[in-house]
Amino acid sequence: MFPRCLRPTVLVRAIKLLVLVSSGIMFIKLVVLEKCTSSLGSLYYYDQNYTYRGSAVGTTETGPKSPEKVRVLVWIMTGPKNLQSKASVVRETWGRRANQLLFFSSVTNETFPTIGLNTTEGRQHLTAKTVQAFRYIYHHHLDDAEWFMKADDDTYVIMENLRHFLSQKNTSEPVYFGYRFKPFVKQGYNSGGAGYVLSREALRRFGKQGTDPKLCEQDGGDEDVHFGQCMQNLGVRITNSTDSDGHTLFHPFHPETHFFGTYPRRINFYAFRKARKGFEGISKHAISFHYVSPTLMRLLELYLYHIRPYAN
């Protein structure tokens, strides 16, 4: 979570969206799809040294696992005013590729549906939403997935790339992944907007001790900072969330902000690794982006899942 001085302006985002519409196919092909092509039916991951096919045999949860066998529960932080304008688009696009998709709001909506939490809307209550949502998931869904991701209703996630990343991780270890910021918490904390992922062991520790206000703030302040402090207090480690070339996988800003390097002025005060731009900054196996409008979500679906170049 950034203070207001670090949040992109509406004007900048609008300009960048126009750039994306005019050059999006080329951008997405180069940044995300180069050597990493997927379809809704059969997943393929390409690397210079090997080819992975979706029919590979998986192993135990404590070792490498076939990506399509990795179970990920995703929960979306939303609100009553955003259900039709934002949350519904998440559900129609990338959210349907999660193994389980839950929406949490301050109000229960049985039609959408959303799970109502004991809190009110507003930025000052995002911490309460987060801790209550994870507590609900601990009590009702701990055994339904190996990994548990929190995202916003303006986050876009490429689930195939997330599963591929997690397939080499151990969900029995107390870890959580995301875009790492460095101030305020000794080990740093992961950006809420970029989305962060807890292992089952991390969720288990939170479920058993997360109600203790001495360990975990229950409301107020910046949600991702407070939750990062909570994770540290529970012995949950932040570990590397970049690819083998050091390029970022989780992204707390709009795609063009990362690609063109138009970051907020104080980004390197916050970023654990120096923020870079272009192909040196964004992994070709990128997992998430933030500040993604409903229109852009649908465009990303088009570019990623429906347009294919002819093979040579």
Segments (PLM) and residue ranges:
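Secretory-pathway lumenal glyco-enzymes, predominantly type II signal-anchor Golgi glycosyltransferases
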Residues: 2-312
